[in-house]
Amino acid sequence: MALLCYNRACGQRFDPETNSDDACTYHPGVPVFHDALKGWSCCKRRTTDFSDFLSIVGCTKGRHNSEKPPEPVKPEVKTTEKKELSELKPKFQEHIIQAPKPVEAIKRPSPDEPMTNLELKISASLKQALDKLKLSSGNEEDKKEEDNDEIKIGTSCKNGGCSKTYRGLESLEEVCVYHSGVPIFHEGMKYWSCCRRKTSDFNTFLAQEGCTKGRHMWTKKDAGKKVVPCRHDWHQTGGEVTISVYAKNSLPELSRVEANSTLLNVHIVFEGEKEFDQNVKLWGVIDVKRSYVTMTATKIEINMRKAEPMQWASLELPAAKKQEKQKDDTTD
């Protein structure tokens, strides 16, 4: 009876009677996800694509392992005894201080003002990174022309959840059992969006059998630009608001950031084929002429000068409440 191997990155079924010391190729380390890069702690290869990460061939040989790893132990949470409400109250006398009336807001400019492209300042680190990418991409194109569409023996299937490798022409006729969705990691749980079988163990997640049948995908076709989400945050000082977009190797000639006094439109092309778009209705008012964009190898910083040195409650202006609108309609 064939057993499932639980070694990381293996997931093959094996016969215990024929199991040998070099039958399994696996990763003895743990998965590492850092700054959008994915890899294993036991080897140096890194990738930004999750399918490529799953297809990274193991770096160690050994025996197949049929023992399922134990679930991670959850910490025991002990609750203290409930205390009387009087004990939780502060031991000093409370004084309620009335807040001062808010300063009257300045008149907000119209959002229909013409948009202006902000100045792009390109760092030396980004220029060096793009020069290296151009050299490597040129070598890859030459290599692709030589290889044409030939599939090499041992190539892993690019479908999510499939661990099969190309063995020859017979592999073209095999049925592929894979996950058609995308991997989701949320609050310690791991699962595929297509079938939602949740687990907290990464090895169990990798060993989940696919829920869709089809053909193997041995090569990835170029689908052109792909709009993707990108991690971003913001901070402010007395006179500036800065938005940081963590997109690596952005392309200045294809990217743009435009704004007027109250609106900001961001379009960034990075890593050759990825796009990030974000439109922001700003909470406050900015001075467009004194605002600019700094592009580095690891991120883009949008530096916006405040029209007045005041604290912003948030980056975006909240949408008007529907209830207030309905109330106004009924009073008319």
UniProtKB/Swiss-Prot annotation:
Q: Region Interaction with PPP5C: list its residue ranges.
A: 2-77
Compositional bias (Basic and acidic residues): 64-82
Task: Locate the region Disordered.
Answer: 62-82
Phosphothreonine modification, residue list: 47
UniProt key word Manganese: no
Q: What is this protein called?
A: Cysteine and histidine-rich domain-containing protein 1
Q: Which PANTHER family match?
A: CYSTEINE AND HISTIDINE-RICH DOMAIN-CONTAINING PROTEIN 1
**Domain CS: start-end pairs:** 227-316
Q: Point out residues bearing the modification N-acetylalanine.
A: 2
Give residues annotated as binding Zn(2+) 1: 5, 10, 24, 64
* Quaternary structure annotation from Swiss-Prot or TrEMBL: Interacts with HSP90AA1, HSP90AB1, PPP5C, ROCK1 and ROCK2.
Q: Which Pfam families match?
A: CHORD, CS
The protein's matches in PROSITE patterns, at most eight in alphabetical order, are given as: CHORD, CS
Binding-site list for Zn(2+) 4: 179, 194-195, 211
List-wise, which residues carry Phosphoserine?
Answer: 51
Function summary = Regulates centrosome duplication, probably by inhibiting the kinase activity of ROCK2. Proposed to act as co-chaperone for HSP90. May play a role in the regulation of NOD1 via a HSP90 chaperone complex. In vitro, has intrinsic chaperone activity. This function may be achieved by inhibiting association of ROCK2 with NPM1. Plays a role in ensuring the localization of the tyrosine kinase receptor EGFR to the plasma membrane, and thus ensures the subsequent regulation of EGFR activity and EGF-induced actin cytoskeleton remodeling. Involved in stress response. Prevents tumorigenesis.
Biological processes per GO annotation: chaperone-mediated protein folding; regulation of cellular response to heat; regulation of centrosome duplication
**For the region Interaction with HSP90AA1 and HSP90AB1, what residue ranges are annotated?**
65-316
Which UniProt keywords are present, listed alphabetically? Acetylation, Chaperone, Metal-binding, Phosphoprotein, Repeat, Stress response, Zinc
**Disulfide bridge partners, by residue number:** none
One GO MF term, please?
metal ion binding
Positions of Zn(2+) 3 binding: 157, 162, 176, 216
Which positions in this protein are listed as binding Zn(2+) 2? 27, 42-43, 59
